[in-house]
Amino acid sequence: ISNPNNTNLSNTEMNDNKSNPIISVDEKRFDSDNHSEDYQAYENLVKKTIDYESLEVTHHDDMRQVDEIVNLIVETVMCKNDKILIASDWYPASLVKKKFLMLTYSHIEYVLHCMSGNTTKVKNIKKYLLAALFNAPSTMNGYYQAEVNHDMPGLVR
């Protein structure tokens, strides 16, 4: 007679399923072989493009945030995914990387200015910064023109 309450064997011991480990996002996004060398190269390129040394002088009190922005740009540029999520929309990674590698001192200054003027609660700062950086080249001039129009209405054409 077999014992229906046989607790000597676990169901998992008789399971023939093969292991399927979950790969974290970071493991999928980055190739670890030359990661630190590539990261350093992109970090140097980004710092040169945004004129990091000038930001250190003009935005000394904001350098922690500037460093976070640099890290976010480099992380995004090194992303191995085909698409990148920006402000609830998926964009081709090539477009996002191109825009991020074209960011300049003025764009970073604009993002810092927008961040300092923001009074609403930001739930996901990474998503917020990604969107601000991605949109900076397309919105910066319009933003400053609107500021001038507001401050000096006599100059409006």
Regions from the PLM with identified roles:
Residues 1-80:
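Charged low-complexity intrinsically disordered patches
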